[in-house]
Design a protein with these regions (language model features):
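Short amphipathic alpha-helical surface micro-motifs
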Residues: 71-74, 123-126, 179-180, 185-188, ...
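A signal for specific C-terminal beta-sheet/loop modules enriched in small/flexible residues
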Residues: 113-125, 162-174, 212-236
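Low-complexity, Pro/Ser/Thr- and charge-rich linker/hinge segments at domain boundaries
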Residues: 160-196
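Alpha-helix capping and helix-coil boundary motifs
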Residues: 27-28, 178-179, 215-218
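Juxtacatalytic substrate-recognition/specificity segment
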Residues: 187, 192-295
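Beta-strand-enriched, solvent-exposed domains that form extended recognition/catalytic surfaces
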Residues: 4-170
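Single conserved hydrophobic/aromatic residue that forms the stacking wall/gate
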Residues: 293-304
Length: 304
């Protein structure tokens, strides 16, 4: 019945000759989405994060073993949609190309008396077509699509989380959004406790309020700072030929509400009171005496 109105099972586009009568014959849940698509009233910001193609990422566990390092993060595909406990969410999945895919709900955990982002959460396997899940806790939804990225079948997978399922918070992706102006627009709209910034090599999953106070506008210099440091580390390790052709996971950074700075399996932590320190290159170089890797058109050099 859905395919009498929509062009495919993700229900992200409707057929051009669809009538209102056909829309009203749909199951009640899908009428709102079909109507919004037909009359072009689907909020552009909501639509950007509810209808997306998710790219494949390597297995962080597998590559930690191969490279004999600690594990990179595996939360490489944030949806920009969060849920509250008890929320029911419909997830519409397109062609999976024979790949395994799931959604993970990442909430908070308590460590040594303070809150921090959990390293993992409830996982809901997905299949092609209509999937329904009920959230057991408040958290951000991440698509888990980890596979051999050199496999020809490791293709992007289209997913639609229709209106009424969770709430859009959004995220900033360097690859997609590119400008400081877009970052400001997105972080200003966000209303969840955490906000996600995706660089080429690092993901910053930090407290929204503290991140916005630390970097109200110039996020590009912050991303460049950390992407460059990770690139330098990879060159020192001799894995620059592996990353990102064979292994493409990000370093995943969180902002615990206690402790200080640390690195562990799957994530690194910076207590949320120091975000203004670690996201400003000038401060790191002047006050932290940090050794930084910088690149420019003329040369690659180490700066102190």
């Amino acid at each position: 019945q859905l395919l009498t109105v929509f062009t495919d099972i993700t229900c992200s586009e409707i057929k051009p000759d669809v009538t209102q009568e056909q829309i009203e014959a749909l199951p009640e849940f899908f009428i709102q989405t079909a109507s919004a698509l037909k009359d072009d009233s689907y909020n552009k910001w909501e639509k950007e994060f509810r209808i997306r193609e998710y790219c494949p990422y390597s297995s962080a566990d597998e590559w930690a073993d191969k490279l004999m390092t600690r594990k990179y993060g595996d939360l490489d595909n944030p949806t920009g949609i969060y849920v509250n406990e008890g929320d029911e969410v419909v997830v519409l999945v397109g062609n999976t190309h024979g790949q395994s895919i799931s959604i993970q709900n990442i909430g908070e955990e308590t460590s040594k008396g303070y809150a921090q982002t959990s390293v993992n959460g409830d996982i809901y396997p997905l299949k092609e077509g209509v999937n329904k899940l009920t959230a057991k806790q408040t958290g951000m939804l991440f698509v888990m699509y980890n596979t051999n990225i050199q496999n020809p079948d490791a293709q992007p997978i289209k997913i639609h989380i229709p209106l009424g399922g969770g709430k859009v918070c959004g995220f900033f992706s360097l690859k997609e959004h590119q400008t400081n102006e877009k970052y400001k627009e997105l972080i200003d709209k966000a209303d969840y406790k955490y906000f996600c910034v995706i660089g080429n090599a690092i993901i910053l999953y930090f407290h929204h309020k503290q991140l916005k106070a630390a970097v109200p506008y110039d996020i590009l210099s912050s991303i460049e700072l950390w992407d460059n440091m990770i690139q330098w580390q990879q060159e020192l390790m001799g894995i620059e030929d592996v990353y990102p052709k064979q292994m493409n996971n990000h370093i995943f950074a969180i902002s615990p509400e206690g402790g200080y700075m640390w690195a562990s399996e799957g994530r690194i932590g910076f207590v949320y009171t120091v975000l203004g320190d670690i996201l400003r290159k000038s401060y790191l170089m002047a006050s932290r005496n940090c050794l930084l890797y910088t690149s420019d058109a003329a040369d690659d050099r180490i700066s102190v």
